[in-house]
Regions:
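Active-site beta-loop-alpha junctions enriched in small/polar residues
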Residues: 1-3, 33-35, 63-67, 106-109, ...
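Aromatic-lined glycan-binding groove of carbohydrate-active enzymes
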Residues: 167-205, 240
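A short acidic, helix-capping loop that chelates divalent metal ions and anchors anionic groups
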Residues: 4-6, 67-74, 267-270
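Alpha-helix N-cap and loop-to-helix initiation/capping positions
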Residues: 7-14, 42, 46, 76-84, ...
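Glycine/proline-rich, positively charged
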Residues: 20, 70-166, 170, 181
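Terminal-tail/helix-coil boundary detector
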Residues: 205-236, 251, 255-256, 265, ...
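Conserved, mostly hydrophobic/aromatic
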Residues: 15, 30, 47, 60, ...
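N-terminal binding-site loop/beta-alpha segment at the start of enzyme catalytic domains
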Residues: 1-58, 307
């Protein structure tokens, strides 16, 4: 996502180089979405161009589910009607330059379209050979079960990190019961868990951290204090706080796959190195003591919070 939106100006050439470097380092899963190109397909096109020489080595995941803003309208609305799903899938196939999508996610649950209809539309695409696996993003336990009854859900993608642990209560028990893999997005707390952070006021208006509650005065200082303690633990382990955060996720179970985003080849190599970091039971206990309930400040404004988390 961050290669074309949400974190300031994009650098297409740099993005392609980073993806190619990821392949060299053994990364096999790339995550994109219709939304990340704001209707232009730019993110999917970037991914498609980058992997053209090694497409068969990669698992390409993309998403449908939004009506994208037009003209001066900044608002995004949900749209998971079956006709729209088919339209987005065809666009994604073209943008990615591939004959199949490995994982097709519903980006957000659409309250106006029964989840059974969504699952049925994706099932048709799977039966046609255009999609291989069905995924959901930020879906609650009930929606997961209802969708699964129509078309088995292979993977759920939801925010999960040392900072955000709400999924541990009901979501992970549900996916584990059904044998669904879990992809953790924002595993580095949108960059907070890299220790390279600054207050919200120092980010530009096109950077989502400028309005993220965790960067706002009061919350920011408490989160920085927690990062300082995590950094001390990382130093004791001979690693970085970034690798510590990713290793923590990997330690939560073999079903957890974090997808850290980066534009930097150096950061990419650091992220991959987290697979070599082993955390002890005492290390995990200390992390729980430092941030027992996750970060200070909500991950989204109330209006944008997924329905399962709003209650």
């Amino acid at each position: 996502m961050g290669m074309t939106m949400a974190y300031g100006a994009a650098d297409e050439a740099g993005g392609i180089a980073t993806i190619k470097r990821a392949h060299d380092l053994g990364v096999t899963l790339l995550d994109t979405a219709e939304l990340y190109g704001n209707g232009t397909g730019s993110n999917e096109k970037l991914v498609g161009e980058a992997v053209a020489g090694f497409r068969d080595d990669m698992v390409l995941a993309t998403k449908f589910g939004f009506v994208l803003p037009r003209g001066s309208d900044p608002n995004r609305q949900l749209d998971s009607r079956p006709d729209r799903i088919r339209e987005v899938a065809e666009n994604s196939l073209r943008y990615l330059g591939t004959d199949h999508i490995d994982v097709l996610y519903q980006h957000r649950v659409d309250p106006d379209v029964p989840i059974e209809d969504v699952a049925g539309a994706v099932k048709e695409l799977i039966d046609a050979g255009k999609v291989r696996y069905f995924g959901l993003s930020e879906a609650g336990p009930d929606d997961i079960r209802r969708a699964y009854a129509v078309q088995p859900v292979s993977v759920l993608q939801t925010e999960y990190s040392i900072f955000e642990r709400a999924v541990e209560k009901e979501i992970l028990p549900t996916t584990r019961e059904l044998g669904i893999g879990f992809v953790a997005y924002s595993p580095l707390g949108r960059g907070f868990l890299t220790s390279q952070v600054k207050p919200a006021s120092e980010y530009g208006p096109d950077d989502m951290r400028s309005f993220d509650e965790r960067w706002q005065p009061g919350n920011y200082e408490q989160n920085v204090a927690a990062i300082e303690r995590l950094t001390e633990l990382a130093q004791q382990k001979g690693t970085s706080v970034t690798q510590l955060a990713l290793a923590w996720l990997l330690a939560q179970g073999d079903d957890i796959v974090p997808i850290p985003g980066t534009r930097s080849p150096d950061r990419l190599a650091e992220n991959v190195g987290a697979a070599d970091v082993t955390l002890t039971a005492d290390d995990l206990k200390l992390v729980d003591e430092i941030l027992p309930g996750g970060s200070f400040g909500s991950r989204y404004a109330e209006a944008n919070m997924p329905s399962w988390e709003r209650g």
